């Protein structure tokens, strides 16, 4: 039994799908015009996705590269047989998506009606075991056997001596360019409908991406390669116009990345914790008095410790510098003082995590990179956000011009 402030994904996986399957079969037992319309409108991605997931079920979850060669290679006869043999399970997976988006659209309409916008995340890469790689292998750097030639990651730095080996397949940008990056255009256009604002993860890979030979033990043998650059964003603007996009431009940032960010017109990100991190030579870029107006400022992202947690887990010298710079005091609350540092800056948008508003410690951090145990499990409890906190937040927003009184 998990504590109430933690999501137990294992239990949900075991208990939720049998119930969902019953609901899906019940929906499929009678005509449903709304479901049919959803399938027709979203068939461009839904058909391959549902087939892929039905095949995963039939293969007991085995990764797609371990399937039999005919279906792994999407041979015509094997695809036809799968569509016939797994027709019901394919339809069930389509119902799951229909139910999700029906609920999501209702939630989004509700919060938009309150004047709230939703920022969604667009991961730069997809998993090797994904419908994208299986259905459109020509878009990725794969060999004749369907294995990645190189995979994604980050080079060694002050935070990791061997770098980060993510393992995702890399895009074949030259091939993608031949049809005007249509796969990417469709992805971005669709997600801009799902969310109000889109944050593109690992923006620097559009300028240069790090390629690590497949099978490497760590990221150290990797090399930087040229990405699609300005041409990608020129085509994006031509096809889709001005879009509400935030660029995650953290990490190893070069002059060419900064130039691409300026040309794209997207605001970049500033992380307050990085301003005081003695391991990071880029600290001055993250100190509030150096912020440009056109940026989005955070105390920390989902990959960082909470504000209160950082005060106890960071190097003592880093914490002392933050205390001096922001005049932090226990009376105000260290976490509240860090938020004040953001709100009083010129950044046009600031983001604080729910955990920081509540003053929670490291036990409530959302994600610890390179670990898999307790990530993305924290959730707030009923009553955590009370009227007293709302009034305090409101006064701060008025004081720093974040809202009008």
Indicate residue ranges for each PLM-predicted region.
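Terminal-tail/helix-coil boundary detector
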Residues: 382-405
């Amino acid at each position: 039994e998990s504590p109430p402030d933690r999501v137990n994904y294992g239990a949900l996986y075991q208990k939720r799908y049998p119930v969902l399957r019953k609901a899906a079969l019940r929906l499929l037992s009678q005509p449903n015009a709304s479901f049919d319309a959803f399938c027709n409108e979203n068939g461009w991605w839904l058909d391959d996705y549902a087939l892929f997931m039905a095949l995963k079920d039939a293969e007991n979850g085995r990764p797609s590269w371990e399937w039999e060669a005919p279906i792994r290679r999407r041979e015509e006869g094997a695809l036809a047989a799968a569509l016939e043999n797994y027709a019901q399970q394919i339809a069930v997976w389509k119902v799951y998506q229909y139910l999700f988006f029906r609920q999501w659209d209702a939630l989004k309409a509700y919060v938009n009606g309150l004047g709230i916008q939703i920022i969604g995340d667009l991961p730069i890469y997809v998993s090797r075991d994904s419908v994208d790689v299986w259905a459109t292998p020509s878009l990725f750097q794969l060999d004749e056997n369907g294995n990645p030639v190189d995979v994604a990651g980050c080079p060694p730095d002050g935070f990791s001596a061997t770098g980060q080996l993510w393992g995702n397949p890399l895009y074949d940008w030259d091939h993608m360019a031949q049809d005007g990056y249509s796969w990417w255009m469709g992805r971005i256009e669709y997600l801009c409908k799902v969310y109000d604002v889109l944050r593109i993860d690992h923006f620097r890979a559009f300028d240069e991406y790090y390629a690590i030979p497949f099978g490497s033990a760590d990221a150290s043998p990797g090399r930087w390669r040229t990405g699609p650059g300005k041409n990608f964003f020129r085509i994006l603007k031509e096809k889709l116009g001005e879009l509400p996009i935030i660029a995650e431009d953290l990490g190893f940032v070069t002059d060419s990345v900064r130039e691409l960010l300026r040309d794209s017109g997207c605001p970049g990100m500033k992380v307050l914790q990085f301003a005081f991190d003695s391991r990071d030579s880029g600290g001055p870029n993250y100190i509030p008095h150096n912020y440009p107006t056109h940026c989005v400022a955070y105390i920390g992202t989902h990959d960082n410790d909470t504000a209160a947690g950082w005060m106890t887990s960071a190097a003592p010298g880093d914490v002392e510098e933050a205390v001096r710079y922001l005049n932090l005091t226990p009376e105000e609350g260290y976490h509240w003082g860090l938020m004040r540092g953001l709100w009083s800056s010129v950044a046009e948008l600031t983001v604080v995590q729910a955990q920081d508003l509540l003053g929670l410690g490291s036990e409530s951090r959302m994600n610890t990179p390179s670990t898999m145990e307790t990530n993305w499990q924290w959730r707030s409890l009923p009553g955590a956000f009370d009227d007293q906190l709302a009034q305090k937040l409101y006064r701060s927003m008025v004081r720093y011009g974040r809202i009008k009184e």
